[in-house]
Amino acid sequence: MSRLNDPVELLQQTRSNFIIESDVSNIKEIKSNMRQLTKLMAEKQTHHNELMKQLQSQLQRQQTKVQALKKNFQEQTSQVKRVEDELNIPKLQQDIDKLVQEINQLRDTIQEGIQKVVETQKQLLNDDTDAAHTIDEEPIGKDDKIRVLKLKLFHSLDVALYNDQLLDLRNEARPLSSSSSSHNIWDEL
């Protein structure tokens, strides 16, 4: 029992019964693993922080682009509005509609004039050649009727033949063409 009373001996004996080398080795390995894990986590944290900075930078650039596009869109919308106001689109549309209506009326008038000329031509060609005589009692031939018809056509188009020149009666009787081409037209008559 004396052994139990001596604390130093008791500690030595207790210590000799314990095998702590494996525990120390395990603790060292755990410490090493913890250091590696801490280092790996720090690297991952650094990587994630850098990635977050990049993403925030990209987000900022995209937001700047969106703001620029919004501003550009607003400016273009404003310009379109100004142009519409300057052009007075509804009035232009009314003017265009009015011009289209006038063109249609002119087309109808021209069509009626052509129809009258065609009817006159039919009448002249269908008239009995024996019944038509000039002042000298000479019969009017088919060629003469065609010439008269052509002259009436020129007259209905407000064009006159004067001194071998075609004159536009709508435009202060200005010549329509050179004398050589009007002379050719007169020869065809």
Curated annotation (Swiss-Prot):
It is found in: Nucleus; Chromosome, Centromere, Kinetochore. It comes from the Eukaryota. GO terms for cellular component: Ndc80 complex; nucleus. Residues 24-124 form a coiled coil. Keywords: Cell cycle, Cell division, Centromere, Chromosome, Coiled coil, Kinetochore, Mitosis, Nucleus. Its main location: nucleus. The keyword Nucleus applies. GO terms for biological process: cell division; sister chromatid biorientation. Component of the NDC80 complex, which consists of NDC80, NUF2, SPC24 and SPC25. Acts as a component of the essential kinetochore-associated NDC80 complex, which is required for chromosome segregation and spindle checkpoint activity. Belongs to the SPC24 family. This is Probable kinetochore protein SPC24. It comes from Kluyveromyces lactis (strain ATCC 8585 / CBS 2359 / DSM 70799 / NBRC 1267 / NRRL Y-1140 / WM37) (Yeast). The lineage of its organism: Eukaryota, Fungi, Dikarya, Ascomycota, Saccharomycotina. The gene is SPC24.
